[in-house]
């Protein structure tokens, strides 16, 4: 799937939110953390990722275009919080107490670990699997692990192994 071009107004709104959150954090933490690099190269079902060593935030342009306001309000501060925790505390658990504190007390945003965006447009092919109680869909990666005998996946409801078909 080709990555969509993001309108400049959306890119500006993302950058504005990033700068507002960063300024707020620098003020509350009495620091002068630099602005991270912002790129729109995240693919798949992840809304964004924070790359600590390169001090970079990668955002998913497809999910951004489909969920502009919520994405800017939640995903941008979420990823920035990861970088700020790394700068302020060093390497910590990705969604640990330091990250939660950074989100809620410093940035003033609810600390949610996952997004609730519709994923139909970014989800790849899936393979049907079933157990005793329901039908399931496995991603290509998980399906290939089953085929190679590297993994067995179980139903979260009944605990039975998932079987292809």
From Swiss-Prot:
One of its GO terms (biological process) is response to stress. PANTHER family: PROTEIN SPRT. This is Protein SprT. Residues 22-163 form the SprT-like domain. Binds 1 zinc ion. One of its GO terms (molecular function) is zinc ion binding. One of its GO terms (cellular component) is cytoplasm. It comes from Salmonella paratyphi C (strain RKS4594). HAMAP family: SprT. It is found in: Cytoplasm. Keywords: Cytoplasm, Metal-binding, Zinc. It comes from the Bacteria. InterPro entries: SprT-like_domain (IPR006640), Uncharacterised_SprT (IPR023483). The keyword Cytoplasm applies. Zn(2+) binds at residues 78, 82.
């Amino acid at each position: 799937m080709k990555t969509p071009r993001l309108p400049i107004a959306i890119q500006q709104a993302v950058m504005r939110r990033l700068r507002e959150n960063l300024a707020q954090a620098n003020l509350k933490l009495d620091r002068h953390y630099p602005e991270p690099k912002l790129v729109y190269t995240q693919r798949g079902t992840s809304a964004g990722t924070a790359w600590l060593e390169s001090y970079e935030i990668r955002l998913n342009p497809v999910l951004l275009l489909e969920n502009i306001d919520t994405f800017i309000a939640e995903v941008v501060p979420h990823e920035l919080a990861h970088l700020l925790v790394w700068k302020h505390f060093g390497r910590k658990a990705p969604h640990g107490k330091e990250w939660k504190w950074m989100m809620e007390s410093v940035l003033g945003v609810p600390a949610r670990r996952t997004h609730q965006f519709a994923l139909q447009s970014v989800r790849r092919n899936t393979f049907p699997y079933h157990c005793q109680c329901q039908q399931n869909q496995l991603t290509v990666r998980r399906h290939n692990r089953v085929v190679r005998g590297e993994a067995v996946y179980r139903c979260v409801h009944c605990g039975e192994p998932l079987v292809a078909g």
